[in-house]
């Protein structure tokens, strides 16, 4: 199916009243004044064809109280540029780690060490998966490149677009619209409203924002944006997710990079405002810290920066050259691959210029990961081969390895099943003692851990440093959502594009917990049977691995039962001795309706 082309008419205009001064200066969003309630009449920013009925009521005071705007620092935080010592240290670690990984696999694949083939090869796949990710991380750590700030030297015409879908909280979208309006650099705002919501339409009229809707939902988010691009005429098109609130200086920090005519897009950090809401939000955020920090800084050096769908600025000519935003569940990666194949380059700005939301509920997180897994694997199978010859060597490597991230679901399943089989059926994956195995595997694992800590010296924000175990446990416990997404891509099952639920009601998700409960029960049965049959050190090691896996599965299964946990909290709250425990449970496990600033 041929993607439509878009007209691109260059325009020149002077700043509008309300656009604001585009000089970089303190301007916290908290100074935004809600528009005054107006009656019929007056200029409207709504799309053509708006009805002549009385406008819907926009309760600005209620919206701002429920969705308070962020306060921004006068200048964005930039990570410290890596010193020569940092680079030398990380490269030495990368070299040592590569040697350790190679030595381990040469030793492991010794024919004398191989056990039962039906256990050895799945275990080898699991270990190889970890090794590939270590090598990918180290290659990016070894060449960090932080671009210097470039102020815009000319006036650009800019369109900022965000989307709205039925079911998304209108307050969240309206807060983003207010923040878009407060961006100081002159620009034109667009709301791409799939549902033609009357409240959003009226808010756009009051704010002077162009409201665009359409009669169908073809190509989901990409089609929604492309529909608005047919009306927009700016030289730069910025795409914001509706939950991402931009800073007033967003455009000031990215536009200067477009002075190079070969730059097709500029991506900034995807940061969050609710990462401390609960265990799920914290884990989901921590899964991204390394990617948006040291890894993307390294990809920038290799010319392989990835557009991530939110807070990305595109040169309009670049988008037009590929027929607009590419469609799909991973439309951001698809668009990136096509832009690189067309010869465009990119810049990564390692600054927090927007803050959004991560899922706070288990259903929201699992649906998001399943969608990304299916979309990324579909790109690897169908798009990557078509653009392969037009990508650079590092782009080829990254866009081959990146979709494999979602194979972690299969790897987690292997990590659970192998100990179960060894305990229940006496299978042997490796004919070696555990001390020898740990002695060969530990160097690579330790180097990986140390390298991450060194690379975190140029993390974006201080709270992004650490071991990120919460993110690992959450991903391990949601193995089936990754695996289901991969299988849907392999079998050609089309998943609908559904916006990720970021905040939901307290509810129990026993259906989502069943895969974990079944796997954990199998671990417990295998441990009991295996140890009753054989008390050998080997069986004790397998039992240890089974306990480790089952504990993670049960923890994530428990966290998904929001209503039950809330009832437990209310019961324990009646007992004074349990008040400290109750407060801790509420902080870690319970996803409430509060908005975390």
Cite the ranges covered by each PLM segment.
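The conserved acidic donor/metal-binding loop of glycosyltransferases
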Residues: 241-245
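Long helical/loop segments within the catalytic core of UDP-sugar-dependent glycosyltransferases
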Residues: 140, 213-236, 248-330, 338-341, ...
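Short, charged cytosolic
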Residues: 25-73, 368-388, 481-492
């Amino acid at each position: 199916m041929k993607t439509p082309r878009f007209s691109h008419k260059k325009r020149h205009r002077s700043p509008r009243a309300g656009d604001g001064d585009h000089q970089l200066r303190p301007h916290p969003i908290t100074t935004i004044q809600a528009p005054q309630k107006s009656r019929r009449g007056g200029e409207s920013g709504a799309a053509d064809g708006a009805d002549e009925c009385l406008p819907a009521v926009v309760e600005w005071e209620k919206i701002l109280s429920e969705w308070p705007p962020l306060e921004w620092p006068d200048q964005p935080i930039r990570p410290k540029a890596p010193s020569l010592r940092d680079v030398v240290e990380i490269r030495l670690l990368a070299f040592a780690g590569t040697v350790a990984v190679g030595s381990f696999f040469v030793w492991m694949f010794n024919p004398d060490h191989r056990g039962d083939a039906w256990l050895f090869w799945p275990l080898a796949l699991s270990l190889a998966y970890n090794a590939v990710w270590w090598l990918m991380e180290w290659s990016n750590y070894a060449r960090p490149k932080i671009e210097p700030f470039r102020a815009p030297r000319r006036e650009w015409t800019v369109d900022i677009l965000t989307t709205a879908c039925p079911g998304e909280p209108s307050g969240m979208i309206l807060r983003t619209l207010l923040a878009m309006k407060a961006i100081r650099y002159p620009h034109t705002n667009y709301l791409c409203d799939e549902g033609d919501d009357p409240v959003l339409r009226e808010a756009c009229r009051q704010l002077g924002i162009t409201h665009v809707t359409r009669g169908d939902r073809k190509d989901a988010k990409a089609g929604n944006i492309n529909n608005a691009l047919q009306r927009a005429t700016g030289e730069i098109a910025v795409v914001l997710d509706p939950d991402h609130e931009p800073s007033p200086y967003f455009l000031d920090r990215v536009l200067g990079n477009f002075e190079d005519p070969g730059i097709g897009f500029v991506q900034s950090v995807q940061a969050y405002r609710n990462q401390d809401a609960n265990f799920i939000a914290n884990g989901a955020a921590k899964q991204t810290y390394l990617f948006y920090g040291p890894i993307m800084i390294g990809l920038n050096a290799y010319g392989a920066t990835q557009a991530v769908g939110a807070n990305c600025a595109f040169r309009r000519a670049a988008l037009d050259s590929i027929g607009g935003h590419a469609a799909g569940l991973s439309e951001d990666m698809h668009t990136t691959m096509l832009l690189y194949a067309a010869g465009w380059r990119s810049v990564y700005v390692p600054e927090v210029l927007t803050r959004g939301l991560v899922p706070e509920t288990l259903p929201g997180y699992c649906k998001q990961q399943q969608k990304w897994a299916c979309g990324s694997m579909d790109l690897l199978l169908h798009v990557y081969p078509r653009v392969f010859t037009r990508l650079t060597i590092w782009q080829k490597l990254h866009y081959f390895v990146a979709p494999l991230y979602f194979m972690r679901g299969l790897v987690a399943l292997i990590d659970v099943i192998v100990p179960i089989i060894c305990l229940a059926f006496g299978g042997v994956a490796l004919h070696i003692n555990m001390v020898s195995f740990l002695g060969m595997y530990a160097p690579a694992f330790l180097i990986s851990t140390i390298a991450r800590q060194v690379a975190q010296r140029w993390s974006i924000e201080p709270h992004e440093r650490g071991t990120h175990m919460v993110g690992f446990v959450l991903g391990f416990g949601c193995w089936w959502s990754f695996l289901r997404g991969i299988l849907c891509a392999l079998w050609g099952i089309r998943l609908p594009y559904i916006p990720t639920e970021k905040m939901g009601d307290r509810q129990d998700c026993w259906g989502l917990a069943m895969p974990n409960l079944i796997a954990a029960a199998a671990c417990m049965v295998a441990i009991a049977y295996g140890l009753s049959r054989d008390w050998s050190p080997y069986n004790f090691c397998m039992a240890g691995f089974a306990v480790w896996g089952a504990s993670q599965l049960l923890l994530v299964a428990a966290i998904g039962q929001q209503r039950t946990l809330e009832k437990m909290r209310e019961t324990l709250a009646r007992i004074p001795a349990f008040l400290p425990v109750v407060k801790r449970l509420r902080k870690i496990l319970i996803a409430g309706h509060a908005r975390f600033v």
